[in-house]
Amino acid sequence: MTWLSEKVGDAVSVDGVFKDVQNLGNSGYFSEVNPVFTSVPEGVKIDFAVVTNPVVHGVVFEGNSVYTSDVLTKYMAIPEGQIMNSVYVGQKVQGINAAYARDGYMLAHVDGIAVDGNGMIHIHIVEGIVEDIVPAGNKKTRNKVITREFVQKTGKPFNKFLVRRSVERVYNLGFFDDVNVRMLPGEKDPNNVIIEIDVLEHKTGTITLGAGYSKSDGLMGIVEFGEDNLRGT
């Protein structure tokens, strides 16, 4: 077996046995590998007690809403009727994570893999749901004025492209000098996210001072005050 470096007639090496255990584990076909040493007249006999992974009979996806299970199945492409190879499954899972990231769902990822007694592989996905959108730093502008510009919606998976467009829409209102986003852990679920939209309102008030003169009123002052973002509407 090519996974084993220890040969009959060789002196037993702890490092060699450890390497063989690693090689067997890294093959992907076994969930457990344990060396068993037995004394024999010729020296020491080494057996490797292994627990073989189950035969695959199908894949079930849980927690996915962005992509259908049919789409995700194409990414997995795990042959049925064969022993599950955990290394191969791990590589395919990375393909799913990459697909989410490519489309802007930067918080989505495969969170767990389990195999039931029927040989069904359960792939659990968390998609980073937006729990809430909370404005901050706005003293004159109402919250709804900010949140209504968001194309990223609560209850939906976080998408960096939608958030970027939302920030641009808020900035284009013309009320703010700066608009930034902070992501906070969800309160209902740690896999969720709360978006804090932090704004810096610019000084919209203008004051004009002047003086004039009329024969009837004499010297008079002129004071004008203007407010662009009146009542934050």
Per-segment meaning from a language model:
Residues 230-233:
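Short loop/turn motifs that connect adjacent beta-strands in outer-membrane beta-barrel proteins
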Residues 1-227:
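Periplasmic polypeptide-binding modules associated with outer-membrane biogenesis and secretion
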